[in-house]
């Protein structure tokens, strides 16, 4: 049997909320593999360094991740009262989202399936 009453269990679960500033983008129109190329480059870096890497990266995913970094930094400053100069990228990951299926007509009546993949990208910052 459970150790406590249902409301007490809920209270305890809600007490251990993650207070780190973060930003999440769901249904980003970029595949997980392509997003991870950029995310691997910025993981563990300071916020300024990560923004510099992302700004000069030619990949499409980097433009999305740049907005996410700026959003997470604004969340840290406004919601958590953190100093932007001390922030660094603690966690960043991309999870698989849904896939849109499209048909590409080919020769002699054939049709190839095109899969347009999506991902859910999360960036978590913290102070050093």
Swiss-Prot record:
Entry-linked CDD domains: Ribosomal_L22
Stored Pfam families: Ribosomal_L22
UniProt KW Cell membrane keyword: no
Keywords, ordered alphabetically: Ribonucleoprotein, Ribosomal protein, RNA-binding, rRNA-binding
InterPro entries: Ribosomal_uL22, Ribosomal_uL22_bac/chlpt-type, Ribosomal_uL22_bac/org-type, Ribosomal_uL22_CS, Ribosomal_uL22_sf
GO molecular function: rRNA binding; structural constituent of ribosome
Origin superkingdom: Bacteria
Disulfide bond entries: none
Biased composition (Basic and acidic residues): 9-20
Record GO biological process: translation
GO cellular component: cytosolic large ribosomal subunit
Region (Disordered): 1-20
Function, as annotated: This protein binds specifically to 23S rRNA; its binding is stimulated by other ribosomal proteins, e.g. L4, L17, and L20. It is important during the early stages of 50S assembly. It makes multiple contacts with different domains of the 23S rRNA in the assembled 50S subunit and ribosome. The globular domain of the protein is located near the polypeptide exit tunnel on the outside of the subunit, while an extended beta-hairpin is found that lines the wall of the exit tunnel in the center of the 70S ribosome.
Family: Belongs to the universal ribosomal protein uL22 family.
Quaternary assembly: Part of the 50S ribosomal subunit.
Annotated PANTHER family: CHLOROPLAST 50S RIBOSOMAL PROTEIN L22-RELATED (PTHR13501), LARGE RIBOSOMAL SUBUNIT PROTEIN UL22M (PTHR13501:SF8)
HAMAP family linked: Ribosomal_uL22_B
UniProt name for this protein: Large ribosomal subunit protein uL22
Organism listed in the record: Lachnospira eligens (strain ATCC 27750 / DSM 3376 / VPI C15-48 / C15-B4)
Gene, per the UniProt record: rplV
